[in-house]
UniProtKB/Swiss-Prot annotation:
Zn(2+) 2 binds at H399, C427, C430. A motif (Bipartite nuclear localization signal) lies at residues 489-511. Zn(2+) 1 binds at H110, C135, C138. InterPro entries: APOBEC/CMP_deaminase_Zn-bd, CMP_dCMP_dom, Cytidine_deaminase-like, dCMP_deaminase-rel, Deoxycytidylate_deaminase_dom. It comes from Macaca fascicularis (Crab-eating macaque). Its main location: cytoplasm. Its cofactor is Zn(2+). This is Cytidine and dCMP deaminase domain-containing protein 1. One of its GO terms (molecular function) is dCMP deaminase activity.
Length: 515
């Protein structure tokens, strides 16, 4: 019990230090996701990375409307729901509190093995966040590489103790081997789960519904049934609870005791642990629902002349959505009290690698924040409502795209296809940086395209040439169908139906997953 109490006190202290700036020293006025919880959520999300080859095949048919609700998750959850002993696992590699790797298991290799192949001796002094407790085969190599800390999600481990296909004896022997490796290594193998700060879940729910992607749907299709977002969220919650939680409390206690967490099996530690896990799953489901697989919406080329040319070069919609959710999670680390923005950069190599992400590999990520090392009172925090332009924040905030480029862990290679996913349209300050860095594709919302605000403008994005732009919109082919059947108008270059009399549309209800 003493160990459990010390762990909670330690993590509470860490939570207090990591809820703010890039240096973790500021306390803001809005709820913020701690870095530990961000890394944990990203590890869970990486476990759900779409199977690349299957998605490329499915992308050719993704407009036929054959999938049920949340059809984009069928392939993502196939491996996790399959009754196999080795569970698919997501992994986040962190060095100096910066993400340097996002990985997931492949058909041939575990996540820990992939990390060794990709990073090698560079894993020394890194922190690793697993979506499941790693097996002994992975742990021995990771420990040998000199990692600093290994954190894992305290549910069913990588060698499953729950599935019918697992050999109970083999799984327990592996768990014992893991404990022996843990007790005899210098690496700290632990559970890092922090309670969410006050009102965090409520804040995420409100901002997810108001985000550009959901609002674009409601603006483009004004006759939409607005319950679609909440229905999507409920489906995601059910799905993720089945994947990442152990519904039976006694079974959960048995797993915890088997994997060396018997000190967490007594209340209040056990009930607190389960509540923290449920809260994080709710948050993940909420954010994932903000970029939904809905009707014919997705990331498409805005220029009709380039649609046929660029289609074969674009990512499958499921992968594009997955990467955008990564950026949405990053946005909850923002230091901007008004607008949180997240950005993540990926690249695609010439050939498929051993990673579960296929040929794609992580390059860098960021969120909008004040300069590294700054304190809360060092810079102004006022927005354009402040008449005195000298004390506004816009001259001091580092944009998400800028942080992603600055702290990238890989070089951007001109011969490879690189892509950046941004939760909002890149502004005029960032567009030339993205092009100059050699990034080939931009995935973003287009709600602000062509707008000029008090302190920031979005004029260059629409005029940008030499970089493929895929914005969140109704599939242009579907928009063309609307053009043939209904009056239309254009909003940011996208066909939009003109609202008709309410009685003409009262029977039209949008359905989830028809994509």
């Amino acid at each position: 019990m003493k160990e459990a109490g010390q762990m909670q006190n330690l993590e509470s202290a860490r939570a207090g230090r990591s809820v703010s700036t890039q240096t973790g020293s500021m306390t803001g006025q809005i709820p913020r996701l701690s870095k530990v919880n961000l890394f944990t959520l990203l590890s869970l999300w990486m476990e759900l990375f779409p199977a690349v080859e299957a998605q490329r095949q499915k992308s050719q048919k993704n407009e036929e409307g054959k999938h049920g609700p949340l059809g984009d998750n069928e392939e993502m959850t196939r491996v996790s729901t399959d009754k196999r002993q080795v569970k698919r696992t997501g992994l986040v590699v962190v060095k100096n509190m910066k993400i340097v790797g996002l990985h997931c298991s492949s058909e041939d290799l575990h996540a820990g093995q992939i990390a060794l192949i990709k990073h090698g001796s560079r894993l020394k002094n890194c922190d690793l966040y697993f979506s499941r407790k790693p097996c002994s085969a992975c742990l021995k190599m990771i420990v040998n590489a000199g990692v600093n800390r290994i954190s894992y999600w305290p549910a069913d481990p990588e060698i499953s103790l729950l599935t019918e296909a697992s050999s109970s004896e083999d799984a327990k022997l592996d768990a014992k081997a893991v404990e022996r490796l843990k007790s005899n290594s210098r690496a700290h193998v632990c559970v890092l789960l922090q309670p969410l700060v006050c009102y965090m879940v409520q804040f995420v729910e409100e901002t997810s519904y108001k985000c550009d992607f959901i609002q674009k749907i409601t603006k483009t299709l004004p006759d939409a049934n607005t319950d679609f977002y909440y229905e999507c969220k409920q489906e995601r919650i059910k799905e993720y609870e089945m994947l990442f939680l152990v519904s039976n409390e006694e079974m959960h206690k048995q797993i915890l005791m088997t994997i060396g967490l018997e000190n967490l099996c007594e209340n209040p530690y056990f009930s607190n642990l389960r509540q923290n896990m449920k809260d994080l799953i709710l948050l993940l489901a909420t954010v994932a629902s903000s970029v939904p697989n809905f009707k014919h919406f997705g990331f498409y080329c805005s220029n009709p002349e380039q649609i046929n040319e660029i289609h074969n070069q674009s990512l499958p919609q499921e992968i594009a959505r997955h990467c955008m959710v990564q950026a949405r999670l990053l946005a909850y680390r923002t230091e901007d009290h008004k607008t949180g923005v997240g950005a993540v950069i990926w690249a695609e190599g010439k050939s498929r690698s051993c990673d579960g992400t296929g040929a794609m590999y992580f390059v860098g990520c960021g969120y909008n924040a004040f300069p590294v090392g700054s304190e809360y009172a060092d810079f102004p925090h006022m927005d354009d409502k402040q008449k005195d332009r000298e004390i506004r924040k816009f001259r001091y905030i580092i944009h998400a795209e800028q942080n992603a480029l600055t702290f990238r862990c890989q070089e951007i290679k001109p011969e490879e296809r690189s892509m950046i996913f941004v939760t909002k349209c890149p502004c005029d300050e960032c567009v030339p940086l993205i092009k100059g860095a050699g990034i080939k594709q931009i995935y973003a919302g287009d709600v602000d395209v062509g707008k000029k605000k008090a302190d920031i403008s979005y004029m260059r994005f629409g005029e940008l040439e030499g970089v493929s732009k895929f914005t969140w919109q109704l599939n242009p082919s579907e928009a063309y169908g609307l053009e043939q059947n209904e009056p239309e108008r254009r909003e940011n270059g996208v066909l939009r139906p003109v609202p008709q009399k309410e009685e003409q549309h009262q029977d039209k209800k949008l359905r989830l997953g028809i994509h």
